UniProtKB/Swiss-Prot annotation:
Residues the entry annotates as binding substrate: 119
Entry's Gene Ontology molecular function annotations: oxidoreductase activity, acting on the CH-OH group of donors, NAD or NADP as acceptor
Positions annotated to bind NADP(+): 214-273
Keyword Cytoplasm in annotation: yes
Primary location recorded for the protein, binned into one broad class: cytoplasm
Homology family: Belongs to the aldo/keto reductase family.
Organism: Papaver somniferum
Active site, renumbered: 56 (proton donor)
Protein name: Non-functional NADPH-dependent codeinone reductase 2
Localization per Swiss-Prot or TrEMBL: Cytoplasm, Cytosol
UniProt EC number: 1.1.1.-
PROSITE patterns associated with the record: ALDOKETO_REDUCTASE_1 (PS00798), ALDOKETO_REDUCTASE_2 (PS00062), ALDOKETO_REDUCTASE_3 (PS00063)
UniProt keywords, alphabetically: Cytoplasm, NADP, Oxidoreductase
Amino acid sequence: MEIGGVPVVTLSSGRGMPILGMGTAENNLQGSERVKLAILKAIEVGYRHFDTAFVYQTEGSLGEAVAEALQNGLIKSRDELFITSKLWCADAYPDHVLPALQNSLRNLKLEYLDLYLIHWPVSLKPGKFVHPIPKDEIFPIDYKSVWAAMEKCQMLGLTKSIGVSNFSCKKLHYLMATANIPPAVNQVEMNPIWQQQKLRDYCKTNNIMVTAYSPLGAKGTMWGSSGVMDSEVLNQISQVRGKSVAQVSLRWVYEQGASLLVKSFNEERMKENLKIFDWELSPEDLKNISELPQRRVSTGDPFVSINGPFKSVEELWDDEV
């Protein structure tokens, strides 16, 4: 099945998700007219999957864009869109999950989400978001009770599917040991220079869809890397294929069986990022990409604390670094 030329994958929840979506996270972006206009343009050129989070402060802008798209006739029904948001760590407590989701729905002016994710496998001191995160306010997450609250949200119809983000194989195993509804998605960093083979294999075995964030390495962000866009191997492949480096990287992610999130507010790049489904990488291309040096860029360092549940980046990712 396709929507506007974008393949749709069926999640373990039985719900369809466009395999390519638009992300809305950016340094100091917050909600703005610029974000709303970019989302409207994305809908116009064919995007139907949008990813936000409470902590991004873009839920309001996305909600305004959806309302305008309906009003302007860009879409006929909200059901044409797939919208994801995320539970922030300060709300990762069993009695906070439902109110947090309801707050996101108010921000978005929607009756339901298509997907709600636990943003990180950690809890923070409840209350207002503070940046940087105080190192003495990082606590272990209670996987069982928080996930049970997520399951309740799905059973109430406030979200059609539930999942996680930034979970290692070990943390997924913890969660699934007591889950009644398995996570439909694990959203993680994934690109040619951080390929996540072990995690992808685990998720495939357990029918969890991997969604790749930063498929181009998040170049230009505070924490991102130019490693993907500057890769000599990817540049050589792009020249031979007559595609951009971005298209080669996105196509590689897609060919690994993952869904992916892209973020550009430039109309031409938005269109370019959609043009990855009618061609293929060669076996030689795939072999060369598989041999690229690997490096995690999104380390999760803000959640590492000598007094917290994760005393090192290695502990946070269970040595999947």
